[in-house]
Structure formats: structure tokens, C-alpha cells
Amino acid sequence: MKKLILGTLLCLSVTIFAQSGNSMASILQKIKSQSKIDTQDKTVYDLMDEFYQKNLQADNDEMTPEFTHKLQKAVSDSNTKNIHLLYLFLMYQQHISQAVAEGKKPNPVFQIETMNLLESETKEVYGKLPAIIYIFKAEALDSGSKKEEAQMTVASGLKEYPDSIPLKVYSYLNTKDENLRKDLTQNHPNHWMVQQFGIK
């Protein structure tokens, strides 16, 4: 029953936020009150990292039915620790996917607030951030016309993850650094982001 309630909350959160102006912080508190927090359990961290590896770092989308099943299993398992982090992550992802599917621009206020919460909650639980949070936060800030903060987020992410292709792409787009351009075109010419942004 708890999972049904949380699942419903997850599905409706974007609509609730947009219609009533409820803050993500209040939604998070409802979700977090049902979550078992365990700083030693890396399941959710590993899922976010695997999502990043398969969806963003790989040359092409390598999402597999096995990974999708693993993700769905974690969401539906009442014993999943730190599930509030996974819910925040999926709320953000759902919001972006829904906006793209409807041909609309994502809500930057929702994006930024969700990513700020996910960043602080993930740091609180794990003491560090997976690369995907730096990427999503930079995208959120960029969509909210906070270009300088987005650039600082990308720079911070690259310090932690110097081999991250998406972070290198965003850094190059911000700085036009010739060394980054060479690295991307020589070492990652087939990466979907290099091709999407026409980096040559």
C-alpha cells in the first residue's frame, strides 16, 4: 500500500507542483518520511550511475530491458533504501520526458528546485554525487537562464569526473576550448552529444 501511495505521489508530483506552486521540498518530505535511509547502501547511487553510463556516457543509448527491469524493481521494492533519491531522480526525468513528448519547454523552476534537492540529499546520504547529477543540474540551470551557475556546475563536475563526455561537451559549448574540441572530435567523434551539437 505504501508503494501505491508513493507511486501515485511520484506520478502526480509534476502536475501538483505546476498547478498549485507546492514546493518540491514539501513533496520531498512526504517521500522521505517513507524512505529507509542508509548511508552504506549504494543501490540507488549505483542505479543513477548506471543510468548515466548507459544513457549519457555511451556513444549511443545503451538502455537495456534488464536495466529498465532493475530500475522498476528498485522503485517497487518496499525494502529499497534511500528510495527518496530515486524518486527525485525519476520525477526530474519524467518531467523532461513529458515536456519533450508534448513539444513543450520544461519548467525551469521545477527543474532547478528538484536538482538542488537531489544534489543536497545525495550528498547528505553518500557524501558525493554521481556524474549525472552535475549534468542534470547544469541543464536545469541553463534552462533557467542561470548560465554562469550552469558553467560552474559543469566545471565542478569535470573536476570529479574528468572523463565525462557530456560534461566535456557542455564545457566546450561554454568555453570553445580548442583542447576540448580536439579531445571530443578525435577521441569521441561517434558520441551522440558530439554529433547532436555538431562539434567538428
Regions found by a protein language model. Give the residues of each.
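Bacterial Sec-dependent N-terminal signal peptides
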Residues: M1-A25
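Amphipathic alpha-helical repeat scaffolds of TPR domains
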Residues: A25-P106, Y126-A140, I165-S171
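TPR-repeat structural position
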Residues: D61, K104, P108-Q111, K147, ...
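Single-residue signature of alpha-solenoid repeat helices
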Residues: F67, Q111-T114, A150, L184
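Alpha-solenoid helical repeat scaffolds
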Residues: H69-Q72, E119, A155, P189
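Canonical positions in the second alpha-helix
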Residues: E121-K123, G157, L184
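Terminal, low-structured helical/coil segments at or just beyond the last alpha-helical repeat
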Residues: K128, Y170-K200
